[in-house]
């Protein structure tokens, strides 16, 4: 092997250990695509105020800011894989429903029914941590990829 080839192989081996290997899901669906998908979902939610009556920041800014502060505290823990790539933003849906959900890319939606039901801030932090984990672990995207694979297999079988 010539000197240039040896140098290139050595440089490749040295630099290969310098960066973290991408997660397998990142090779199929990038984190920026999560953000785009989450933004598209948010646009759909905004377009359907009868089903998803979001509280406005103009009228309920204090409540939204309070929850966003809790979110920011959890995101700053340093334990998330995508904290620098996802925009963890809290939204409140004005409906008497005991639920919350996270969109790909970090947007989260909490129903007023759940917020009013929970008695302690720690309970809400627990739910919020759960939703943040869904986004950070990319559960929605993994499910979409899995479902598309199943659909592909079904279409190939038929």
What would you call each of these model-derived segments?
Residues 3-10, 16-158:
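A Zn2+-metalloprotease active-site environment signal
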């Amino acid at each position: 092997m010539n000197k240039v080839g040896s140098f290139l192989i050595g440089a490749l081996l040295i630099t290969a250990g310098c960066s973290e290997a991408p997660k397998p899901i990142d090779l199929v669906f990038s984190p920026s695509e999560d953000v785009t998908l989450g933004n598209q979902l948010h646009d759909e939610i905004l377009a359907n105020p009868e089903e998803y009556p979001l509280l406005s920041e103009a009228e309920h800014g204090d409540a939204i800011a309070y929850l966003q502060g809790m979110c920011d505290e959890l995101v700053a823990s340093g334990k998330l894989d995508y904290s620098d790539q996802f925009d963890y933003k809290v939204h409140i849906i004005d409906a008497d429903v005991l639920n919350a959900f996270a969109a790909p890319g970090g947007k989260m939606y909490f129903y007023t029914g759940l917020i009013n039901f929970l008695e302690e801030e720690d309970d809400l932090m627990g739910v919020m941590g759960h939703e943040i984990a869904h986004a950070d672990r990319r559960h929605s995207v993994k499910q979409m990829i899995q479902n598309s694979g199943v659909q592909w297999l079904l279409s190939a079988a038929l």
